[in-house]
């Protein structure tokens, strides 16, 4: 997909949704705490659950982004996605990096298929490693690639590896932007803006938690109903964010692309066309899960309103 994108001057897929992907574990956990808090009818229990839950998320988020080696607190899928993107870039590196977990598994599977076609019995495959072990391998692979990049570009351009989520986020974003159109004059402002955005989102989440705790303490009013409204509207927020990034891709075209096309808005859902390339964009089952949860939360809102009305009437 990225190969097609760069022909028309679009940035790689890894250049989009950078903040959203990095903060998604904490945001989803936060939404879960909000729903649980909204379901609690007793105020002390509600405030206690939300206070403990939010404090744990803040600690987890802070350790992930700003502590040395904090990347290990991210989920395996996120770290694996970084590795997948770096594997796609391997062809442009001077020295081929060590095979990652994904590449090793693919090579093993291909070898097994070839052995079966020849009528041979493939050697027993090793048992799948645990997610924590795989994540450690992914992080080590990122560290090796980071250090090679530091040796190539110089210690002034690339700081020493500390393994924090914040450092890896910005470095990987810069590498993604420069995969096909390596123009530092264009890339540096984008990386700087993403750095500011990461701090804004980090402290914005903390501020939002304080507001929600205030609403939970009151047990009524608009801040209280946000506990259910925000999770229920998650599919809407997803479509807005997804559409915004599609707009960004279509309006941030690089002049170094092989084809010259006018800025465009890619099709959000359905089939579309960019130059002579066809596009297909359809929701996956995860979007269906969000819709189901929205309906469930809407029913919770109706029941809670009836409960509050009965309490007020009594």
Spans of model-derived segments:
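Hydrophobic alpha-helical transmembrane segments
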Residues: 20-38, 195-213, 288-296
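Long, compositionally biased interface segments
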Residues: 270-314
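Membrane-water interface of alpha-helical transmembrane segments
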Residues: 192-198, 218-228, 277-287
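Hydrophobic alpha-helical membrane-insertion segments
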Residues: 54-68, 226-252
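Cytoplasmic juxtamembrane regions at transmembrane-helix boundaries
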Residues: 27-59, 213-230, 297-314
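Short, low-complexity cationic-aromatic patches
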Residues: 23-25, 47-52, 278-285
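Conserved, well-structured core segments that form or line functional sites
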Residues: 201-208, 222-236
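Long, glycine/tryptophan/cysteine-rich extracytoplasmic
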Residues: 1-21, 66-194, 242-284
């Amino acid at each position: 997909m990225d190969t097609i994108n760069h022909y028309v001057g679009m940035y790689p897929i890894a250049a989009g949704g950078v903040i959203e992907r990095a903060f998604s574990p904490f945001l989803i956990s936060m939404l879960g705490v909000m729903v649980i808090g909204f379901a609690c009818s007793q105020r002390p229990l509600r405030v206690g659950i939300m206070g403990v839950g939010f404090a744990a998320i803040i600690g987890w988020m802070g350790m992930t982004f700003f502590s040395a080696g904090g990347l290990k607190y991210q989920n395996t899928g996120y770290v694996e996605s970084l590795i997948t993107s770096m594997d796609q870039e391997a062809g442009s590196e001077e020295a081929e990096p060590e095979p990652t977990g994904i590449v090793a598994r693919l090579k093993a599977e291909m070898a097994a298929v070839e052995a079966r076609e020849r009528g041979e019995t493939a050697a027993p495959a090793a048992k799948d490693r645990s997610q924590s072990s795989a994540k450690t391998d992914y992080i080590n692979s990122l560290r090796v690639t980071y250090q090679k990049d530091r040796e190539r570009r110089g210690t002034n351009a690339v700081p020493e590896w500390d393994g924090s989520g914040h450092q890896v986020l910005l470095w990987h974003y810069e590498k993604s932007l420069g995969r096909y159109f390596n123009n530092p004059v264009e890339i540096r402002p984008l990386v700087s803006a993403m750095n500011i955005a990461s701090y804004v989102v980090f402290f914005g989440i903390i501020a939002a938690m304080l507001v929600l705790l205030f609403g939970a303490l009151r047990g009524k009013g608009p801040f209280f109903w946000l506990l259910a409204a925000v999770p229920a509207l998650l599919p809407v927020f997803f479509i807005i964010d997804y559409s915004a990034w599609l707009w960004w891709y279509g309006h941030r075209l690089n002049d170094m692309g092989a084809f010259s096309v006018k800025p465009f808005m890619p099709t959000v859902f359905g089939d579309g066309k960019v130059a002579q390339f066809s596009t297909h964009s359809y929701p996956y089952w995860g979007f269906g899960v969000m819709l189901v949860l929205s309906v469930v939360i809407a029913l919770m809102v109706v029941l809670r309103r009836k409960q509050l009305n009965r309490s007020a009437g009594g």
